[in-house]
């Protein structure tokens, strides 16, 4: 059975930014906690598609979104 999954990437990124700020993490602090570089986190928050799925999941899991 084929499953179509649609992801609102922009909405997910905006929610991640909101959670980071609500938890009072700087980008640098969240990057360390998630195990990614600050430039990677910055790319994620800017919605750039060059980030790997693995790194996106690290960030989302750290924020409780995955």
Question: Which ranges hold each PLM region?
Answer:
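Short basic helix-loop element that most often maps to the first helix and adjoining turn
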Residues: 14-31, 58
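Short glycine/serine/threonine/alanine-rich loop segments
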Residues: 25, 36, 65
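Recognition helix of helix-turn-helix/homeodomain-like DNA-binding domains
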Residues: 35-49
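N-terminal flexible/basic segments that precede or flank functional cores
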Residues: 1-11, 46, 61
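Ser/Thr-centric signal marking residues that sit
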Residues: 26, 40, 52
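DNA major-groove recognition helix of helix-turn-helix/homeodomain DNA-binding modules
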Residues: 54-66
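Helix-turn-helix/winged-helix DNA-binding modules
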Residues: 22, 48-51
